UniProtKB/Swiss-Prot annotation:
GO terms for cellular component: chloroplast membrane; plastid. Involved in thiol transport from the plastid to the cytosol. Transports probably both glutathione (GSH) and its precursor, gamma-glutamylcysteine (gamma-EC). Exhibits some functional redundancy with CLT1 in maintaining the root GSH pool. One of its GO terms (biological process) is defense response to oomycetes. This is Protein CLT3, chloroplastic. Its main location: plastid. The chain crosses the membrane at residues 105-125, 137-157, 175-195, 202-222, 230-250, 258-278, 307-327, 353-373, 389-409, 412-432. Pfam families: CRT-like. Keywords: Chloroplast, Membrane, Plastid, Transit peptide, Transmembrane, Transmembrane helix, Transport.
Length: 452
């Protein structure tokens, strides 16, 4: 009667060996032992002829402790699922739980960082438009084309430092092309619709972004969301609508706006949602291609931004027309915008605050995009969207304060406090895990028996 064993070591390398006569010191690796006979030395006899035992063990160091090495040490645990008996060390469970807690803490930290950058991004964009109020299209193109140079510069230094590897750079580029096309089309559709919709109406319609992300996560990632998560997302979106658009005539504005512009704005957020979920798919797929290694987020930022810039360049005749700039005058417009941005030259009247305020916006926007993509990488597209959504009412509140260059502060919307409470309740409900919801989680982490 031969006994075969497959050993998966949890150290820096994995080894698969056949063990016939020795019993190793096992407390830190996983040994999957297939028994084709009934071992009378075991205190428990099961009539099944095929059993898999999963046992926490230390890598074998060549010393044999004898037959007694099979006896469970204090602190070990065992249980069975069907015909499968599972044995392991309680310390292994502690490490898994600690790892989950560390990841949860990291997600919370990056969610807070993303929300903070989101607030700063919204505030600094409004401040940047003070000196560039005549050149908003220039600022938009600076954000599109200037960031490509910034991201590739960062990527170059990370490659030189060894953080980015050749294997990472060799991943397929077609997904990045699709991301660039989606984001460029989303920008074009959003600009066209925003020109015919009021600000509060756009805020209401922007909440469909979260809906599309949930939809695409279910379709392309196979995710399943619990009732409390769906309800939590709904409350977050409702809270933003109530806190920002209440009392502003948003409903009346939507009734007056044409159906075409409403559908075009919804299409814009659909394309953005698809692009965001596709980035998550890229991160997940890269782990398989890189054999468990994590794809550097600056690769996604760099290639995605480059393809988006190419698509935007092709759409410039259409986009300039949306901004009321004849295409034959676009070159002069961009040149004058650059002079105002630098605040150096003949066109400096009304450019007070440049280049300081626009540069602050550029820095804040880059930080926001990096934090948003980092949060998406370690969590999901939906979580990153929720963190970004929280920044909306906070920014609205900050605009009620006497900020420099903005003049008279705005007043809070009538339903701001009520909407904020709804939003917070939605966030709590989304993150709440009902008791016993993870009871089946253990089954999903038990490795399947190797083929026979």
């Amino acid at each position: 009667m031969a006994t075969t064993s497959r050993r998966f070591t949890t150290g820096l390398f994995a080894s698969i060996t056949s063990v016939k006569s020795h019993s190793a010191n096992r407390p830190q690796s996983i040994s999957l032992i297939r028994r084709n006979h009934i071992d009378h030395r075991l205190p428990l006899i099961v009539p099944s002829s095929r059993r898999w035992i999963i046992q926490a063990a230390r890598s074998w160091d060549g010393f044999d402790d004898g037959a007694e090495a099979e006896i469970k040490k204090p602190g070990a645990y065992g249980y069975a699922i069907g015909d499968n008996e599972i044995e392991g060390s309680s310390s292994s469970t502690v490490h898994v739980i600690d790892g989950e807690h560390v990841k949860t803490a990291e997600i919370v930290i990056w969610a807070a960082v993303t929300a903070a950058f989101g607030v700063g991004n919204r505030v600094m964009y409004k401040l940047a438009l003070v000196p560039l109020k005549e050149y908003p299209f220039f600022l938009a193109q600076l954000s599109t084309f200037g960031y490509v140079a910034v991201y590739y510069t960062i990527l170059y230094f990370r490659y030189r430092a060894g953080t980015v590897t050749d294997a990472m750079l060799s991943v397929p580029k077609s997904p990045f092309l699709i991301v660039g096309i989606l984001e460029a089309l989303a920008a074009a559709a959003g600009m066209a619709a925003a020109a015919n919709l009021s600000g509060p109406s756009t805020t209401v319609l922007s909440q469909t972004f979260l809906v599309w992300q949930i939809f695409f996560s279910i379709i392309f990632l196979g995710r399943r969301y619990s009732v409390n998560q769906i309800l939590g997302c709904t409350l977050v979106a409702l809270g933003v609508i109530v806190s920002v658009a209440s009392g502003s005539g948003a409903a009346h504005s939507l009734n007056e706006a044409g159906v075409l512009w409403i559908l075009l704005m919804v299409l814009s957020f659909l394309l953005q949602g698809a692009g965001t979920v596709l980035k998550e798919v890229i991160f997940i797929d890269s782990q398989r291609r890189l054999k468990g290694a994590s794809l550097d987020l600056f690769i996604v930022n760099s290639y995605g931004s480059a393809f988006q810039a190419i698509c935007i360049a092709l759409l410039l005749p259409f986009l300039s027309k949306l901004w009321g700039i004849p295409f034959n005058q676009l070159g002069t417009y961009l040149k004058d915008g650059a002079v105002c941005f630098l605040n150096n030259g003949t066109i400096t009247k009304g450019c007070d605050g440049a280049p300081f305020l626009p540069l602050l916006f550029v820095i804040m926007n880059i930080g926001y995009n990096i934090a948003l993509l980092r949060l998406l990488k370690i969590s999901s597209a939906v979580v990153s969207c929720l963190a970004s959504t929280v920044s909306v009412p906070i920014a609205v509140f900050l605009f009620t304060m006497p900020l420099p260059y903005l003049g008279v502060a705005s007043s809070l919307p009538k339903g701001f406090m009520g909407g904020t409470i709804i939003l917070v309740l939605g966030m709590i409900l989304y993150s709440w895990t009902p008791h016993g919801a993870n009871s089946s989680h253990t089954d999903s982490v038990i490795p399947s028996p190797p083929p026979t």
